[in-house]
């Protein structure tokens, strides 16, 4: 990703940092190590004098800006003409090209609107509020609540922090994008590092920069001039040489900071009302472990201090729910440096993993999917045919076998195409629904590996539907019903987006139109709200994007419903139609509900906070004897529940009191605690209570097993209450 792309608010937020986990870190956040140049617990102070490159860069910029302003003034005088600006309600406002700005139009409506507007949107593209309009256009004025406005707000905040970092550390700034919640900036330091002790002085300097209301200025400059301007910074020069393919690109200035950036930005630094620096880590240049080590600092900002308080509360809750912490505490899974990005699932974690797969497998039988098993290793010729070798080979594990190049599969679809093609196919076989839980490997950069959310080895509930064009609508309806069934059992709400034909698409436009219409019909019949995402489909077919919402309000994308017109062409897949045409091409629907099973386990762990629903719980039953005389009976009870296929344990610790044993079981999130004493031993019963201390009383063993089996089979979300 280029500097412009990485810093652009139009770039997809969250690419650098996922909602679950931190991303690309190899040093504990907020490292306490003392810097060589540091000032003890007080951290670093602002450099005096500033690094020489700041003044040299500013002198060069000022000269270029004066020339630019002169040209712009001349253009405004010479080329300005009346234009019409159309607002969202259809009202038109008169303006002058090269003179009138979105901010002036906002002021004309109301000063309150102008003050609360973060950024403009001109002809659907984000635009600086103080940048003159150039032609007839549509205009939207976005407030902080809008996602694109948030990205701009956090992007501008990153520049404020970047200015402070230059003035405190004097290093070379690298990337500084907005992310899912906030922003970060990377910096290369010749010596020393960043300490959490520095945060206070950085924040103080950021507040000073904000108070100064430094204007954000945009300037388009020739590439060769920028190479001279940034000659002190090898990273900016790399970006210019390797990523910028145009004769000119843009820089933005606030105060003494000038940085490569596509923009846009808020009007001035004073628009950032509250800013907090909350974390640091180290990372590698572009995530590659053989490149330079960089220091990364994370921040967050808001237009209202109350929002920061809410964010801090949310962060504390998210920290307590971190799947890596819960995974360790509950002995579910772990990672090891000898196999980075490949999870070790312990017995209780494996139970969750296998239960999820069996859940999907049971739905497959109801819905006409046929499960298959396919190879893990393929000759590279397969990936050349599919097109993955050209675009994805860097992310594949490849190796030589008998002088031929092979690779571990990163996805199942090409193998399923070979399956479809291994014999002639008839229209009577369609739709053919092929499901595969095969192990996949993707060569993620080591710096990007994050818990279960970014791994190298994983499995998906992957399926491909081979169907005729006219069958798309019904198949999509089936996929949508499938995901609603699964997500309702998990307790997730979700939102849907239809992403349609992009500008650069492959195939016949009529085929696209017909397919998109069928997707629309399916979504309308589904009955849930959905939004149109025009032009955001893949080049090979339209798709439905599904985002689930977890217990603390975060959104995650797991499910996939993607049409593919190109893979059948690349593999020359055909079927004989009912009228005898043996050259008919199927459409492929790529479909997953859980997505990566590993990632879904991370999301579920955090969603439930480790408090697993009974059917999925790795700790369903704990048997607690009142005393040693009941141990033998307790063992028999445990064996009966084990034989009934429950996850059951027993606490025979003689050093613990009964109350302590019960409390330990509740804290360990055992759904049901079965207490057995002399009375229960005599009558062949158990005394039942739940992890939330709801007492259900005495029941026979057979009665208890039967009821728990019913609750398990129904996948009840509240089994403890419903018992």
Swiss-Prot record:
UniProt keyword annotations, A-Z: Acetylation, Aminoacyl-tRNA synthetase, ATP-binding, Cytoplasm, Ligase, Nucleotide-binding, Phosphoprotein, Protein biosynthesis, Ubl conjugation
Residue(s) carrying Phosphoserine: 39, 702
| CDD domains in UniProt | TGS_ThrRS (cd01667), ThrRS_anticodon (cd00860), ThrRS_core (cd00771)
Primary subcellular site in the record, as a coarse category? cytoplasm
Annotated region (Disordered), positions in chain = 1-49
Compartments, record wording: Cytoplasm
Q: Which reaction does it catalyse?
A: tRNA(Thr) + L-threonine + ATP = L-threonyl-tRNA(Thr) + AMP + diphosphate + H(+)
What GO molecular function terms would the record report? Answer: ATP binding; identical protein binding; threonine-tRNA ligase activity; zinc ion binding
EC number(s)? 6.1.1.3
Question: Which SUPFAM superfamilies does this one have?
Answer: Class II aaRS ABD-related, Class II aaRS and biotin synthetases, TGS-like, ThrRS/AlaRS common domain
Post-translational modification Phosphotyrosine, affected residues: 298
Is NADP one of the keywords UniProt gives this record? no
InterPro entries in alphabetical order:
aa-tRNA-synt_IIb, aa-tRNA-synth_II, aa-tRNA-synth_II/BPL/LPL, Anticodon-bd, Anticodon-bd_dom_sf, Beta-grasp_dom_sf, TGS, TGS-like
Q: Which residues form the TGS domain?
A: 79-143
Ranges of compositional bias, category Basic and acidic residues: 13-39
Gene Ontology biological process: threonyl-tRNA aminoacylation
Spell out the GO cellular component terms annotated for this protein, sorted alphabetically and separated by semicolons.
Answer: cytoplasm; mitochondrion
* Phosphothreonine found at: 246, 453
Q: Which residues carry this modification: N6-acetyllysine?
A: 243
Processing and modification events after translation: ISGylated.
Q: Supply the PANTHER family for this chain.
A: THREONINE--TRNA LIGASE 1, CYTOPLASMIC (PTHR11451:SF36), THREONINE-TRNA LIGASE (PTHR11451)
Q: Write out the similarity annotation.
A: Belongs to the class-II aminoacyl-tRNA synthetase family.
Q: What does this protein do?
A: Catalyzes the attachment of threonine to tRNA(Thr) in a two-step reaction: threonine is first activated by ATP to form Thr-AMP and then transferred to the acceptor end of tRNA(Thr). Also edits incorrectly charged tRNA(Thr) via its editing domain, at the post-transfer stage.
List, alphabetically, the HAMAP family matched: Thr_tRNA_synth
Q: How does it assemble?
A: Homodimer.
The protein here is known as Threonine--tRNA ligase 1, cytoplasmic
* Lineage of producing organism: Eukaryota, Metazoa, Chordata, Craniata, Vertebrata
This protein's gene is called: TARS1
């Amino acid at each position: 990703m280029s500097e412009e792309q990485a810093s652009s608010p139009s770039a997809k937020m969250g690419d650098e940092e996922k909602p679950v986990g931190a991303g690309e870190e190899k040093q504990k956040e907020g490292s306490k190590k003392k810097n060589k140049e540091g000032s003890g617990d007080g951290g670093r102070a602002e450099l005096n004098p500033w690094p020489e490159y700041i003044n040299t860069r500013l002198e060069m910029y000022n000269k270029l800006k004066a020339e630019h302003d002169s040209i712009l003034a001349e253009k405004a005088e010479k080329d300005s003409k009346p234009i019409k600006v159309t607002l969202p309600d259809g009202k038109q406002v008169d303006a002058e090209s090269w003179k009138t700005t979105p901010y002036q139009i906002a002021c004309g409506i109301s000063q309150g609107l102008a003050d609360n507007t973060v950024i403009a949107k001109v002809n659907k593209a984000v635009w600086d509020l103080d940048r003159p309009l150039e032609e007839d256009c549509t205009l939207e004025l976005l407030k902080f609540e809008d996602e694109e406005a948030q990205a701009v707000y956090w992007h501008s905040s990153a520049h404020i922090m970047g200015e402070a970092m230059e003035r405190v550390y004097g290093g070379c700034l690298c990337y500084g994008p907005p992310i899912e919640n906030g922003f970060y900036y990377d910096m290369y330091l010749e010596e020393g590092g960043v300490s959490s002790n520095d945060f206070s002085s950085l924040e103080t300097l950021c507040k000073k920069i904000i108070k100064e209301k430094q204007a954000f200025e945009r300037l388009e400059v020739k590439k060769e001039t920028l190479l001279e301007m940034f000659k002190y910074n090898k990273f900016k020069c790399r970006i210019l040489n390797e990523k910028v393919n145009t004769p000119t690109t843009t820089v933005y200035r606030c105060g003494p900071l000038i940085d490569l950036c596509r923009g846009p930005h808020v009007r001035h630094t004073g628009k950032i009302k509250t800013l907090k620096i909350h974390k640091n880590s180290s990372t590698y240049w572009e995530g590659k472990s053989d490149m330079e080590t960089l220091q990364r600092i994370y921040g967050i900002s808001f237009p209202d201090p109350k929002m920061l308080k809410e964010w801090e509360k949310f962060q504390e809750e998210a920290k307590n729910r971190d799947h890596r912490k819960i995974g360790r505490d509950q002995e579910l899974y772990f990672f090891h440096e000898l196999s980075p990005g490949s999870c070790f699932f312990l017995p209780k974690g494996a139970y969750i993993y296998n239960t999820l797969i069996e859940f999907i497998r049971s739905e497959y039988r109801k819905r006409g999917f046929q499960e298959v098993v396919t190879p893990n290793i393929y000759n590279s010729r397969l990936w050349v045919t599919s097109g993955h070798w050209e675009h994805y080979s860097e992310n594949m594990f490849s190796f030589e076998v008998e002088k031929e190049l092979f690779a571990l599969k990163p996805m199942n679809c090409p193998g399923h195409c070979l399956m479809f093609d291994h014999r002639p196919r008839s229209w009577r076989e369609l739709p053919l629904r092929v499901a595969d839980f095969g192990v996949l490997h993707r060569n993620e950069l080591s710096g990007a590996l994050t818990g279960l959310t970014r791994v190298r080895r994983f499995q998906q509930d992957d399926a491909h539907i081979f169907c005729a064009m006219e069958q798309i609508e019904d198949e999509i309806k089936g996929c949508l019903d499938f995901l609603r069934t699964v997500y309702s059992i998990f307790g997730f709400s979700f939102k849907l987006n239809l992403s349609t034909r992009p500008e650069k698409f492959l195939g016949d436009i009529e085929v696209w139109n017909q397919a998109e219409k069928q997707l629309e019909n399916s979504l309308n019949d589904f009955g849930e709200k959905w939004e149109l995402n025009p032009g955001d489909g893949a080049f090979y077919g339209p798709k439905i994007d599904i985002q689930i919402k977890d217990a603390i309000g975060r959104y995650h994308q797991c499910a996939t419903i993607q049409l593919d017109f190109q893979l059948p062409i690349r593999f020359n897949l055909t079927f004989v139609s009912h009228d005898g045409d043996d050259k008919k091409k199927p459409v492929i629907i790529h479909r997953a509900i859980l997505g990566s099973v590993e990632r879904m386990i991370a999301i579920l762990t955090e969603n439930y906070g480790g408090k697993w629903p009974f059917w999925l719980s790795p700790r369903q039953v704990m048997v607690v004897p009142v005393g040693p005389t009941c141990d033998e009976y307790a063992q028999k009870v445990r064996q009966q529940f084990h034989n009934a296929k429950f996850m059951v344990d027993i606490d025979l610790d003689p050093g613990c009191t009964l109350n302590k044993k019960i409390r330990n079981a509740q804290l360990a999130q055992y759904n049901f605690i079965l207490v057995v004493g002399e009375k229960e031993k005599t009558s062949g019963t158990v005394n039942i209570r739940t992890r939330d201390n709801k007492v259900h009383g005495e029941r026979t063993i057979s009665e208890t097993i039967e009821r728990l089996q019913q609750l398990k089979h129904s996948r009840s979300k509240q089994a403890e209450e419903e018992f």
